[in-house]
Amino acid sequence: MDYLPIFVELKGRLVLLVGGGEVAARKATLLLRAGALLQVVAPELCSELQQRYQAGELEWYQGEFQPEYLDGIFLVIAATDDRILNHQVFSEADKRSILVNVVDDQVHCSFIFPSIIDRSPVLVAISSAGKAPVLARLIREKLEALLPSSLGTMAKIAGKWRERVKQRLTSMRQRRSFWEQAFNGRFAMLVANGQIQQAEKQLEQQLEQSDLQGELALVGAGPGDPGLLTLKGLQVIQQADVVLYDHLVSSDVLDLIRRDADKICVGKRAGNHSVSQEETNRLIVKFARQGKKVVRLKGGDPFIFGRGGEELQVAASAGIPFQVVPGITAAIGATAYAGIPLTHREHSQSITFITGHCREKGNELDWPALARGHQTLVIYMGTVKAALISHQLILHGRAEDTPVAVIGCGTRLEQQVLTGTLLELEQLAQQAPSPALLVVGEVAQLHHQIAWFGQQSIAKISRPAVVDFA
């Protein structure tokens, strides 16, 4: 972090603005809105600053900058087109440990101005640390569209009710849940519609019925890239009191969870169940009965080889309200990022998803059906059983030279795609980083032509594996 983002109280503080042109006028508008006692040093003032001076909104020292003008000053801005003068202002202010900003000269700044979204008393500040001001402006424009104009009014009402809520709800968790419900519910809608009295009545009713009920949200985290987490998924994990997450959830997605939420890893890996499913079920019920918002965060989609349905059955049996937020499953996300279309008119007319967590004999899968041509087979958690899968498919008629791909860390910056043939599947799987997805079918060869993300060089096995299942 190059800069510490802070909000500075300027009401009643002396601020010196050196410069009298249009740029200085824009800074003056911002400073006066923040309540600063503004002093301007310039030989002449532009029309806007002249009007403010005549209205008594600022003091004007007509003439050149003098170091003694810094006496008693809290903050300084140099906004002239004279570089030598700007550098002098910076030097004199810096010697006195006074915060100083030289417009469009980051080297001579002890602080910089962010892009601002003003929904007072709510303020959003966006900065690129001076590296990309246009990018910061574009981010601000996107956020402006997302944040309702009623946000400030909502915050003012909340401020008025804050002490009353604090007296009624003694724990921080209760208060947080109360306000989250208010800001996401009918209260917010009424404020947005300008129905302020009705909005306050809604708050009063909510406060009278403030007994907290726990709930469960089953959320799909997607395959790894945090940009593939759904908007609803992001909203839910940022409201959670407790997040029970799997190993497959990427660290980038975990970073999006609200900082004061309890994060508990209940992940299971092949051959190593660090937390049993029974213990996970117990934790869901335990925390929800404490009135907490519990998020069960699973890699990919929670209903595809994630045991999400079993966990919802437990919640339903315990009388715990729940919701499901789908996620982009690895078979969709990882193959897209690898440049492997799951269907193609010339190569594949159907898709089958299977899990590699199968018994050694492999009797539970319909291998003859899986071995048919002109289809794409995607195997989750198949690294350990890659040799068995390859053997069974070849045994039941799939050609040894069928193209395959193993996608390790799909959609993440460290993504690797290894391609080869079905006969080489075990060796490819052993080389790929975890988590890995196995793709069998002619579409795998299209990676060479339309790979677009991350490491596009292809690792390919040249010698076939020799596996004896006799």
From Swiss-Prot:
EC number(s) recorded for this UniProt protein:
2.1.1.107, 1.3.1.76, 4.99.1.4
Question: Active site annotated at which positions?
Answer: 246 (proton acceptor), 268 (proton donor)
Q: Which SUPFAM superfamilies match?
A: NAD(P)-binding Rossmann-fold domains, Siroheme synthase middle domains-like, Tetrapyrrole methylase
The family database entries (PROSITE patterns) matched by this protein are listed as:
SUMT_1, SUMT_2
Q: Alphabetically list the UniProt keywords.
A: Cobalamin biosynthesis, Lyase, Methyltransferase, Multifunctional enzyme, NAD, Oxidoreductase, Phosphoprotein, Porphyrin biosynthesis, S-adenosyl-L-methionine, Transferase
What single Pfam family name could you report for this chain, choosing any that match? TP_methylase
Q: Which GO terms describe its molecular function?
A: NAD binding; precorrin-2 dehydrogenase activity; sirohydrochlorin ferrochelatase activity; uroporphyrin-III C-methyltransferase activity
Q: Where is this region: Uroporphyrinogen-III C-methyltransferase?
A: 214-470
Q: Which reaction does it catalyse?
A: uroporphyrinogen III + 2 S-adenosyl-L-methionine = precorrin-2 + 2 S-adenosyl-L-homocysteine + H(+); precorrin-2 + NAD(+) = sirohydrochlorin + NADH + 2 H(+); siroheme + 2 H(+) = sirohydrochlorin + Fe(2+)
Which residues does the record give as S-adenosyl-L-methionine binding sites?
223, 299-301, 304, 329-330, 381, 410
Record-level GO BP terms: cobalamin biosynthetic process; methylation; siroheme biosynthetic process
Question: Record's superkingdom?
Answer: Bacteria
Question: Residues annotated as region Precorrin-2 dehydrogenase /sirohydrochlorin ferrochelatase?
Answer: 1-203
Residues that bind NAD(+): 22-23, 43-44
Pathway field: Cofactor biosynthesis; adenosylcobalamin biosynthesis; precorrin-2 from uroporphyrinogen III: step 1/1; Cofactor biosynthesis; adenosylcobalamin biosynthesis; sirohydrochlorin from precorrin-2: step 1/1; Porphyrin-containing compound metabolism; siroheme biosynthesis; precorrin-2 from uroporphyrinogen III: step 1/1; Porphyrin-containing compound metabolism; siroheme biosynthesis; siroheme from sirohydrochlorin: step 1/1
Tell me the Gene3D superfamilies matching this sequence.
Cobalt-precorrin-4 Transmethylase, Domain 1 (3.40.1010.10), Methyltransferase, Cobalt-precorrin-4 Transmethylase, Domain 2 (3.30.950.10), NAD(P)-binding Rossmann-like Domain (3.40.50.720), Sirohaem synthase, dimerisation domain (1.10.8.210), Siroheme synthase, domain 2 (3.30.160.110)
Q: Where does the record place the modification Phosphoserine?
A: 128
Which HAMAP family did the record assign?
A: Siroheme_synth
Describe the family membership recorded for this protein in Swiss-Prot or TrEMBL: In the N-terminal section; belongs to the precorrin-2 dehydrogenase / sirohydrochlorin ferrochelatase family.
Functional note: Then it catalyzes the NAD-dependent ring dehydrogenation of precorrin-2 to yield sirohydrochlorin. Finally, it catalyzes the ferrochelation of sirohydrochlorin to yield siroheme.
Name-wise, this protein is Siroheme synthase
Per the UniProt record, the source organism is: Photorhabdus laumondii subsp. laumondii (strain DSM 15139 / CIP 105565 / TT01)
The encoding gene is cysG
